[in-house]
Amino acid sequence: MRKLLSTFIFALMTMVTFAQGEHMTFKGIPLQGPLNTFIQKLKDKGFTHMEQTKDGALLKGKFATYNDCLVFVYTEKSNVSSVVVLFPEQETWNAITNRYYTLKEMLTEKYGMPETIERFSDEEPISDFLRFYALLKDECIYKSEFKTKNGSIVLTMKKVDYRTASVIIKYNDNINEEESRKTMMDDL
């Protein structure tokens, strides 16, 4: 009995350790390792590498059936830490909310119910034109956060410039965030 209990506890500890060691993925690629390796894997999936800086890289390609998405891959200490997808810009409330709610529905189906905030700073405007104008003035927030065992996915709508806005998805990795937090705590 004791041997069986010991074996069970060992197996459970191994599973917990393994689960904690998994990184969040983007298009099936774990958010870890050197930037150049991650870029190559995205290029293998059809993305075009556009630019690289000390903080990450910019790629362009098809994501979730939408063409011309911009993908920002961020690094910390030369390792991939998070990914942000900027969908093509929209110029109307109807267009951007259709995209937001379509993606929210798909993410909900895959990851479960999100924590959601969808509201205007003041009273909701009476027309779609004024709703879009409120978005461009940062007077509303549409944000859904999906939490998983390996990280989170944040879906939002944000102003791009004075006349356009975009739906954005950010993939965050728990392991990378914890390592970053640990580094910050060491500095303090």
Regions inferred by a protein language model and the residue ranges of each:
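Mid-chain, structured segments of secreted extracytoplasmic proteins
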Residues: 61-106
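Sec-dependent N-terminal signal peptides
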Residues: 4-17
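Non-cytosolic coordination micro-motifs
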Residues: 20-54, 88-188
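Accessory recognition modules or surfaces
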Residues: 25, 29-35, 53-76
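Small/flexible residues
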Residues: 4-5, 45, 62, 183
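Sterically constrained small-residue positions within well-ordered secondary structures
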Residues: 10, 63-64, 74-76, 135-137, ...
